[in-house]
Amino acid sequence: MSVMYKKILYPTDFSETAEIALKHVKAFKTLKAEEVILLHVIDEREIKKRDIFSLLLGVAGLNKSVEEFENELKNKLTEEAKNKMENIKKELEDVGFKVKDIIVVGIPHEEIVKIAEDEGVDIIIMGSHGKTNLKEILLGSVTENVIKKSNKPVLVVKRKNS
């Protein structure tokens, strides 16, 4: 029985470890991989934290509701993600992949698992740690939860040793 990984899910938070994982995604082209689902999840919990923080500081504006502020923040974060993903998408297309890019707002590990299922990917390739990169822990919480909850194979790429 031969295992083929034709369709890859590459979730990124644009961290250094995610960049290292991208190199591994590209290497799968030599193994006949054809398509990459490029995913960025805007963490809805972070948006809620920023809402509270901004309201406490009063920078949300006197005439804005929490909902308006939340929508502005989601739009801003989505626009930033689109710009970063455009470069990654081009890199992947340059090595011959068909690329579908997705940006969603939600709980990162839940969205990664859901999109892996919805898109019918063969493997998930992701970094071991995200932006927090706590050195004391073996795996980041998003990666750990994806491993626990997904029925897809997960290739976890380690961060650089420091």
Swiss-Prot record:
The keyword DNA-binding does not apply. ATP binds at P11, V41, G127, S128, H129, G130, K131, T132, N133, S141, V142, T143. Keywords: ATP-binding, Cytoplasm, Nucleotide-binding. Its cofactor is Mn(2+). It comes from the Archaea. GO terms for cellular component: cytoplasm. The keyword ATP-binding applies. It is found in: Cytoplasm. It holds the Pfam family Usp. CDD domains: USP-like. SUPFAM superfamilies: Adenine nucleotide alpha hydrolases-like. InterPro entries: Rossmann-like_a/b/a_fold, Universal_stress_UspA, UspA. One of its GO terms (molecular function) is ATP binding. Gene3D superfamilies: HUPs. Binds 1 Mn(2+) ion per subunit. Homodimer. Belongs to the universal stress protein A family. This is Universal stress protein MJ0577. It comes from Methanocaldococcus jannaschii (strain ATCC 43067 / DSM 2661 / JAL-1 / JCM 10045 / NBRC 100440).
